[in-house]
Every structure is written in C-alpha cells, then in structure tokens.
Amino acid sequence: MKTELLIITALESELKREALPSGVEIVYTGIGKINAAIISIKAIHQYSPKRILNFGTVGKINPQLHGLLEIGKVIQRDMDAEPLAPRGSTPFCIRPQEYLSTGQFLCGSGDSFVTAQDPWLLSKDVD
C-alpha cells in the first residue's frame, strides 16, 4: 500500500488518527528511539510514503518557544563518543546534512530527560 504522507509519532495522545485527512497514514511507535526505529522501518516498507513527518511532544530549553515547531537540525545531546566524534555527533555518520529539514530550530534528542542545566546544550543553542 502506498501513501503520500506517513506521520510517525510516539503516542496516540500526541496526535489522534481521527484528526487526519483521508490518505494520510499514522503509526504510533511507543516511547524511545529503538521503538521508533523499528516501527518506522516497518511502516516505511508497508506504506512506501513519498513524505514522512515525525511529529511529537518535546521539552524545551528556550522558555520563549511554544506551539508546533519545524526542526532544522537534530543533535544527539547525550551522545558522547569522544575521541571518535565530538559530543552531540554520532561516530561514522558521514552524511548528516541529508537528515536536515528547512526548519530553524535545533532539537537535542536523547534517551534521558534533561533535569538540570547543561552548559553544553546552551553553548550549542539547543532550543
């Protein structure tokens, strides 16, 4: 089955299927990057989408931000694989520019919650 648009989100509470127009498919991955990767690959194979929209709820560092934001770049905020790559970078990822969108905001993705100030995140202008 082919679809024009596939929306990937973690939880049904983030975006209800009923809110979508016909012809748009949505998959719920559950929480976590491993779940998201597995379910996303299965959905891509099942629906062969022309476009994929990753939709979700995130925290924020910048108190001025509200609403729906278009992310332009993502860094792995809790990835520290030095000396193989600098903090925030995934080692051996040779084409990170291919994963960017036209949005203006920087998302710091991670496998943990940010519970304290991190000067590194502020220095990288993570939103």
Predicted regions, residues:
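Extreme N-terminal starter segment of soluble prokaryotic enzymes
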Residues: M1-L6, V24
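Glycine-rich phosphate- or other oxyanion-binding loops that anchor nucleotides, phosphorylated ligands
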Residues: L15-D127
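Short polar catalytic/cofactor-binding loops
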Residues: T9-E14
